[in-house]
């Protein structure tokens, strides 16, 4: 059957499939465009299944925010998603990035809290056209209270789109979040988190089992020292506290003022603003790192 070039082009524009594939699909479907579109989709889904086991080490992290009325109120909700693929070439493709942004917007608008079929279908649509294994690996949605509730969301995505941060702050004095210096500090905390990628917010958040294991490691380090037991224990405790300071957000030296920890800098900013600041939630995504 002879297939008109305009029909092939029309099908290609709709599906993104190659010209020869579109022509073959139209021939298989006796020129029926809807049938050909379905044919291509089914073939694409089959190809996706064949590629499912391929490694997806590339991708992007994207954030979308909804802002409350009035610029001073900050974001009322923030969505962050991680979309992965096989190659750096696709990860940098405008269409792939646009897909991640649409997914983040959908999470924001529909308050999705987990990956669902609607979102998977959005990924499949592009994956069938670019012939690469893709996956929406995780998403998160954080909400702030009303403008006067004493809550504030700040966020940051690194330019390479491989690290994203959303931080939630609270205060008993809601007006502190109207101050530019407090908001700047909140944003700087996001920059800090992206640079240092702390594993925990507070020392109390570190699992007891992990602390025990690290203590045993440090005890092994000092076992051969010719020192009294209480001195060895003091050395172990010092090493443990230093290690916890390295992996806990509040204990790390603040990125913009390394003479103070994040915790002490936050206390300083809060005191100057007239209201104590607190972290209520910290969400850090690194591409491929769960």
Curated annotation (Swiss-Prot):
Taxonomy, superkingdom: Bacteria
Family affiliation: Belongs to the EF-Ts family.
Origin species: Treponema pallidum (strain Nichols)
GO molecular function: translation elongation factor activity
Places the protein is found: Cytoplasm
One cellular component (GO) term of this entry: cytoplasm
Protein known as: Elongation factor Ts
NCBIfam families: tsf
Record Gene3D superfamilies: 1.10.286.20, DNA helicase RuvA subunit, C-terminal domain, Elongation factor Ts, dimerisation domain
